[in-house]
């Protein structure tokens, strides 16, 4: 799952992005924009990197340094002699600008139905060096010692088109296989975030160990399409995994009886959802999988406060605010009823507080509601309501295949210590003793060995995915999947 704020948009759990696909321009025209450009919107600096790719097309990425977001791929770039148009999927936004001269673009940034001015200025080589792409030594690069095929396929009624990469060994087969399932938000097949590509790292490692790996673009990322309206929930994304599962079973190089699922965060919610109704899923690996959507959201609010030394009173106050918000997200039918319910509960809570607390840090009802107002439309999405109601036990009680559940000890987005115990006990109570759980010391939500272990640190770390966690996964698969 994702958790990174971009301008007015929140993405639950582990912030991720879409795979870059660029539109065609000639090398000569594309080179007009090549370089690093900078602009500011709502006090937030944005950095655009444009380059002419091997095919002569302009490609781009965007950074938001203040938010710790780097390497956000631009889905399409269309360049003419005097203009540029960019489309992004995370955030869902666009940028259109006129080229005033070699160093200035005058344009508009559009996001969430709003448009605002955003002018970009080309940075000098010295300035651009400050925003150079971060070092990511684990990201695999060709040539690979295995097959790596770009594939595309549709769901049964052709309403969803999925783009993916299938990797598999050059010799032998048919191979045991696994589908990688991303966390929440719009993510590409590599689960790209902060310049890291953890799914590319996992796929490379497992393929070298003799497995086939399918990693898939989310809807509206990379080559994938499909409905992403306010009515779409995790259940719809589970159906996309079912589509991938059916496609993979039909491939001649794949052992159809040995296909499993590896899910990260929200993807680890989806894995048991699919396995509960598809008894031919051979195994599950859960990476930071939540036991309860509601409790995970509360944990995400409180754990950072504890980490930064907030007082007990302030933490208790924050918990009440969070619970008021969550209660009304479930009961409200629209933004107006949500705000009305929040106002009523919050005022009742304040009336019972001592004056000392109200004076120190408690927000007035007006300020509290003002802080929620920009988010209300997003909080009314069906996706959030499904998340709040999600309970892993509803699915794990029906899972009969082997399960490996891993969590990082330093994760501040999912309470792994308690959730791993819950997953273990739930499976065993349901008669499935083929479960292994492990809380890996020193790892964060992205399975990086961390120092400060904050969300802001994700992009500062060079490690994309812990070699220790990779080895645990590979060894477990060798024992439980290969035969």
Show the residue positions of the predicted features.
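Short beta-strand element of the alpha/beta-hydrolase
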Residues: 174-184
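Short beta-strand/loop motif that positions the catalytic acidic residue
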Residues: 399, 405-407
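N-terminal cap/lid segment of alpha/beta-hydrolase-fold proteins
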Residues: 129-173
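Alpha/beta-hydrolase active-site loop
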Residues: 231-252
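Central antiparallel beta-sheet cores of small beta-barrel/beta-sandwich binding domains
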Residues: 24-100, 106-111, 145
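Short amphipathic alpha-helix adjacent to the substrate-entry channel of hydrolases
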Residues: 192-213
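Conserved alpha/beta-hydrolase "acid-adjacent" motif
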Residues: 412-420
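Accessory cap/linker subdomain of secreted extracellular hydrolases
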Residues: 287-397
